[in-house]
Amino acid sequence: GTPYLNPDFDKGQIIFENGNTYSGEIRIDLVAQNFQIKGKNGKITPIEVNDKVKIEINGNQYKLHAINSTEYGEIGILRECIELENISLHYFPRKKLQKPIEAGISAPTSGYGKTDNPEWKDDGFYFFQINSKYLRVPTKYKKLLELNIFDEEKLKTFRKKNKLDLKKEDKLIELVKYFNDN
């Protein structure tokens, strides 16, 4: 794996607050939390953006958000899943370095031991954004109840009616729409 959302550069657009746009080849560096553009000469340039700039890649909108979390960092590039008045859903694409799992039994060393290099693994998750606060979406229903952000009875009703799966984006979007209106 790589520290990039997609190792290849994709056609994208940078949309500035004043309405100006820049189209070109763009990719996201998830570790440095910045965007990179590839010039016509093949030169790769990292670009710093603020929370007023939107980046569109493959139909998805990304934006820098001030998460202000000790656990997830001050800022993060989030993909906008749905933005509504009372509650929004964002995806936080992340990668982490993970060492390969080694077998329990090892052969005697020959001096030519091959150590496996760590690899970049997807480690992304969703955030609810409520009143400018970012709450990580848990993958377990009980943990969602413990967050105490939704009325428990309404949540139970929604869960029964909609087969809530906290790992599926389309189900989370339905949940956000439901609680935005109720």
Over which residues does each language-model region extend?
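Aromatic-enriched hydrophobic runs in primary sequence
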Residues: 7, 28-29, 159
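A short, Trp-centered hydrophobic/proline-enriched beta-strand micro-motif
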Residues: 5-15
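Short arginine-rich
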Residues: 182
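A short, solvent-exposed beta-edge/loop patch
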Residues: 111-179
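N-terminal secretory-pathway/extracellular module detecting exported/lumenal segments
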Residues: 1-3
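Aromatic-patch recognition
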Residues: 15-141
